[in-house]
Curated annotation (Swiss-Prot):
Residues of the SpoVT-AbrB domain: 5-47, 76-119
Pfam families: MraZ (PF02381)
One biological process term in Gene Ontology: negative regulation of DNA-templated transcription initiation
Domain of life: Bacteria
Organism, scientific name: Staphylococcus aureus (strain NCTC 8325 / PS 47)
Principal location listed in the UniProt entry: cytoplasm
Official protein name in the record: Transcriptional regulator MraZ
Gene behind this protein: mraZ
Source species taxonomy: Bacteria, Bacillati, Bacillota, Bacilli, Bacillales
Subunit structure and binding partners: Forms oligomers.
Amino acid sequence: MFMGEYDHQLDTKGRMIIPSKFRYDLNERFIITRGLDKCLFGYTLDEWQQIEEKMKTLPMTKKDARKFMRMFFSGAVEVELDKQGRINIPQNLRKYANLTKECTVIGVSNRIEIWDRETWNDFYEESEESFEDIAEDLIDFDF
């Protein structure tokens, strides 16, 4: 399970260190792709297989299903950690998520998310105000 928030930087070659707490669970190779809210999603290979199976159940007769699958899968790439614990983020994904230098990597249960730091900070501030209301609307159990 992935959790936590870590600040890192992209180097000039588009490489970024993956937090050490995430590396063990991700293994040496994992998948990154376009996420929602202008971030990147990162999945273990096992989790990615489960997502693929779920996506196969989407009705191809629905235009939005086709559109979503095209965007999601066309952006997917398998990445490999180098000896320094870095991955190379392709230019098309850096552009999609507006990743330039300062990044934030967060753990979200079954995936990691890679954000432009300013975009993450804006999202966090906006969401922090409504966190309790969202919990009340969505969660039907105590924790």
